[in-house]
């Protein structure tokens, strides 16, 4: 596997036991864990309510629906990469519908090597999504710090009659003097004065 330090969780939606057996051989536990199999879309939807998967692999069509709508819905979950395997006769039509939604597609029948390449593409896409998620988390944390510092400034302005500039300087200086983050200091000020 390309990203050997990562283990990917996989949900396989397929009613074809022969396909499931072949795919099991391609998903070693060292790279893919857990690997859960369900045979229809209803069970897959229930499974996605319970946990987030890195990969969802759909072997269409399924007994209860074609699988295209589910592929789009599963792809809209943050960080989930979806591969939809579809019959070659309808490949172009379905690919045109789902590719713009971020769903990877491959035509069936499929060679083992092609499927392995698809898994590598999925890993690459998942790692890119993981980096974007980390950036988003960092931005959210920064915004939370700014909100707390601003709230602490307003408390200092109201309680100690400081100007905004004085309150800002006070928070910066106290954080440096105490060797704590501005967020920690702001939380302490908020707790003290409210």
Label each residue range with its predicted role.
Residues 6-18, 23-27, 56:
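Conserved acidic segment of CheY-like receiver
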Residues 20, 41-44, 54-76, 89-90:
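Conserved phosphotransfer microenvironments
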Residues 33-40:
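Short hydrophobic/Thr-rich beta-strand motif most characteristic of the beta2 strand and flanking loop
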Residues 68-69, 88-104:
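Alpha4 helix (beta4-alpha4-beta5 surface) of REC/receiver domains from two-component response regulators
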Residues 79-89:
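A short, hydrophobic beta-strand element within the central beta-sheet of small alpha/beta folds
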Residues 110-119:
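C-terminal output helix
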Residues 120-134:
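The C-terminal output helix
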Residues 137-194:
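C-terminal output/effector regions of signal-responsive regulators
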């Amino acid at each position: 596997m390309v990203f050997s330090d990562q283990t990917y969780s996989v949900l396989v939606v397929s009613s074809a036991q022969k396909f499931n057996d072949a795919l099991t051989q391609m998903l070693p536990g060292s790279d893919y864990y857990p690997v859960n199999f369900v045979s229809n879309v209803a069970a897959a939807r229930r499974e996605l309510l319970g946990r987030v998967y890195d990969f969802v692999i759909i072997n269409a069509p399924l007994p209860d629906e074609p699988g295209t709508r589910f592929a789009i819905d599963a792809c809209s979950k943050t960080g989930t990469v979806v591969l939809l395997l579809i019959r070659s006769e309808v490949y172009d039509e379905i690919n045109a519908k789902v590719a713009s939604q971020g769903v990877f597609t491959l035509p069936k029948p499929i060679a083992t090597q092609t499927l392995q390449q698809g898994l590598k593409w999925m890993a690459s896409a998942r790692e890119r999504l993981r980096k974007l998620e980390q950036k988003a988390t960092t931005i959210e944390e920064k915004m939370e710090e700014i909100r707390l510092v601003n709230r602490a400034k307003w408390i200092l302005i109201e309680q100690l009659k400081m100007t905004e500039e004085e309150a800002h300087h006070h928070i910066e200086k106290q954080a440096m003097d105490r060797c704590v983050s501005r967020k920690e200091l702001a939380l302490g000020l908020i707790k003290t004065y409210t």
